[in-house]
UniProtKB/Swiss-Prot annotation:
PROSITE patterns assigned: BPL_LPL_CATALYTIC, LIPB
Site feature Lowers pKa of active site Cys, where: K167
BPL/LPL catalytic domain residues: 58-239
Alphabetical keyword list: Acyltransferase, Cytoplasm, Transferase
Positions with a binding annotation for substrate: R98, G99, G100, Q101, I102, T103, Y104, H105, A170, L171, G172, G183, L184, S185
Designated name of the protein: Octanoyltransferase
Catalytic reaction annotation: octanoyl-[ACP] + L-lysyl-[protein] = N(6)-octanoyl-L-lysyl-[protein] + holo-[ACP] + H(+)
Function, in words: Catalyzes the transfer of endogenously produced octanoic acid from octanoyl-acyl-carrier-protein onto the lipoyl domains of lipoate-dependent enzymes. Lipoyl-ACP can also act as a substrate although octanoyl-ACP is likely to be the physiological substrate.
EC number: 2.3.1.181
CDD domains xref list: LipB (cd16444)
Pathway membership: Protein modification; protein lipoylation via endogenous pathway; protein N(6)-(lipoyl)lysine from octanoyl-[acyl-carrier-protein]: step 1/2
Entry-linked PANTHER family: LIPOYLTRANSFERASE 2, MITOCHONDRIAL-RELATED, OCTANOYLTRANSFERASE
Amino acid sequence: MSAPPVSIVPSAPAAPDAAASVAPNPPAALPVTVRWLGETPYDACFDAMRAFTDARTPDTDDEIWVVEHPPVYTLGQAGNPAHLLVADSGVPLVKVDRGGQITYHGPGQIVAYLLVDLRRRKLMVRTLVTRIEEAVIETLAAYNLASARKAGAPGIYVESGPHRGAKIAALGLKIRNGCSYHGLSVNVKMDLRPFLAINPCGYAGLETIDMASLGATADWHEVAQTLVRRLIAHLDGATAAAALPQQALEQSND
């Protein structure tokens, strides 16, 4: 990745100025700030996104944080610790407040946290989840990888070939005061062995795969850029993410 790690200090988020808050007619797309956080420990992001969500106001811009974590297992609030099959794996386990069971984050995986005001965007939780899933499916399709949802199993799965049914992306959200945090992960090119020490997302024997194993040669940063564009387009209700204007993507390392 080209972006260096940054310190996350989420004091009260800044509200836009009065001129920026006046919506034109017809209304423009709601702004989204994208923060490229480099390699950042999971605990720092977890604490920061909760603090950001607690401090935000109705005028706070939505944000997407894009990050790569050192190795860590995370267990959702209703997760069963028995899904961690190897107690002495050497990889830390963090209990978190998102939905879902256990998953793994590590180098070579894109993690995108969506800090979104659902009420302002008039989104139901299920609609947000569907739009996130569609953004991931479109991202993978951009690299000639066919993928699909699976009923009753959040995330995105390989649709065809010898790895059909393998999980390539995970998703888990928390909604507090009408705003989301946590998000999704996409496996680009990573060491998949830590997934063997868990029942991924609570499913025994579920194969986990990455884009590189399926023949995709794109690097982490290229895929992350594609994913962010798809996510922003779908947050605005777009059906063709390729139409996203360049100026709509605000990037920040602050």
